[in-house]
Design a protein with these regions (language model features):
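An alpha-helical repeat/solenoid feature that recognizes helix-turn-helix modules
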Residues: 2-24, 47-81, 97-125, 129, ...
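Long, well-ordered core segments of solenoidal/helical folds
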Residues: 23-41, 81-99, 128-147, 176-195, ...
C-alpha cells in the first residue's frame, strides 16, 4: 500500500521544521502540551490568549482538535510515546462516536499515530474486516450527486468532506467506490474564476475548497494542464498583500488556514513562484504568540491547536522547499 498522503504531508512539514531553532520549537511544544485536557484529548479555542497556557477549564476534548494537537506535536517530531499514552484513553472512549466524516477521519488518524508511537492498537478488539466495515460506514455519507456529505443526513455533497473521505479510504487501504462519480462531482464544483466552491449553490470560489478539490483530483490522478492553470490563476487572485492567502477574493486579509492550504496546493501543483517566500515567512511568524501557539490572522486574539498546526505547517512546507 502506498504511504498515505496525510503521513507524507506530516513528514514534509517535520522535515522543514527541523531547521528551526530549538527555543522556538520548544515554545510551541509547550503550548501544545498545555492544551491537552486531563482526559487525554485536546479542546478548541475559548481561552483568551493571555491565559492560553493555564488550565483549560471549560474546554471539552474533541476528536477534531485532538487530531490537530497530535499533528502539531508530530510536526515538531515531539509526539512521544508518553504523549500518545495520555491520548489513548480518550480515543478508546470515543471509538464509537462517529457522527460526522470529521469524527471518523480524526479518530482514525489519531489512533494510527498512537499505534505508531506506542504499539497500542486501539482496533485490536475490532473484527478482522474492520476496514471493510468502516468503508461501508463511509458510504453512508455519500450523496446522490457523487460526493460525500458532512453527516448521514446530508442531501448534497461537500467538497471538503469528500476530500476527507478520500483520505480516509487511503488510510484504511480500501478503494473508494465509483471514483469517476467523485471526480465528476468535484469538477461540477469548479467556477469561472478557476477555483472551487464548497457546496453547489455557491458562486464564489474559496481557497480551502479549492485546495480540497485539488487534493481529491490529485489522489485520483485527474489534474490536467488546464485545471492546473485555472487553479493557479485563482490562487494568484487570492494572494494577500500581507504575504499569505485570503479565504476568497472578497476577504481583505490573509489567514493561516487559507495560507497553509493555498501554499500546499501551489506546491502540489509544482508552482512556487506565486508567493514570495520571505513575505510568506514574515506573515506566518507575525501570528506567533510570545508564549507559544499561533493565531488565525493578524486581527485574532486567541490561539488554539488547529491554527498552531497551520502556522507550523506553513513554515514546515516553506522551509522544506528552501532549506
Amino acid at each position: 500500500m502506498a504511504h498515505p498522503y496525510l503521513f507524507r504531508l506530516d513528514e514534509r512539514v517535520a522535515r522543514g521544521l527541523s531547521h528551526w531553532d530549538p527555543t522556538s520549537r520548544e515554545r510551541h511544544h509547550q503550548f501544545l502540551l498545555s492544551q491537552q485536557n486531563p482526559d487525554g484529548g485536546f479542546g478548541g479555542r475559548g481561552i483568551p490568549v493571555e491565559y492560553a497556557n493555564e488550565e483549560p477549564e471549560g474546554r471539552d476534548s474533541d476528536l477534531y482538535y485532538t487530531a490537530f494537537g497530535i499533528r502539531g506535536l508530530a510536526a515538531l517530531k515531539l509526539f512521544t510515546s508518553q504523549d500518545a499514552r495520555r491520548v489513548a484513553p480518550f480515543l478508546e472512549g470515543t471509538r464509537h462516536y462517529h457522527a460526522t466524516v470529521i469524527d471518523v477521519v480524526s479518530w482514525l488518524y489519531s489512533a494510527l499515530m498512537v499505534q505508531a508511537a506506542t504499539g497500542i492498537d486501539l482496533l485490536a478488539q475490532a473484527s478482522a474486516d474492520w476496514p471493510q466495515e468502516l468503508a461501508a460506514r463511509l458510504e453512508g455519507f455519500r450523496s446522490s450527486d457523487g460526493g460525500y456529505s458532512k453527516t448521514h443526513e446530508g442531501a448534497i455533497g461537500s467538497t471538503y468532506h469528500s476530500f476527507l473521505v478520500a483520505l480516509c479510504y487511503e488510510l484504511i487501504g480500501q478503494r473508494l467506490p465509483e471514483p469517476d462519480k467523485l471526480v465528476s462531482f468535484i469538477r461540477s464544483r469548479q467556477r469561472d474564476d478557476g477555483g472551487f466552491v464548497e457546496i453547489s449553490p455557491m458562486k464564489r470560489s474559496g481557497t480551502n475548497p479549492t485546495a480540497a478539490a485539488i487534493g481529491v483530483m490529485t489522489l485520483h490522478s485527474a489534474v490536467g494542464p488546464n485545471l492546473r492553470d485555472d487553479v493557479l490563476g485563482y490562487l494568484a487572485d487570492v494572494r494577500s498583500d500581507e504575504g499569505g492567502f485570503q479565504a476568497n477574493s472578497r476577504i481583505p486579509f490573509a489567514d493561516s488556514l487559507s495560507t497553509f492550504t493555498g501554499y500546499l496546493t501551489c506546491l502540489d501543483l509544482n508552482e512556487k513562484a506565486i508567493t514570495d517566500p520571505k513575505r510568506l515567512e514574515e506573515f506566518i511568524l507575525s501570528l506567533q504568540h510570545p508564549t507559544g501557539g499561533f493565531r488565525a490572522a493578524t486581527w485574532d486574539q486567541s490561539t488554539d491547536v488547529e491554527y498552531t498546526f497551520y502556522g507550523l505547517g506553513t513554515l514546515g512546507l516553506l522551509w522544506s522547499e528552501s532549506k
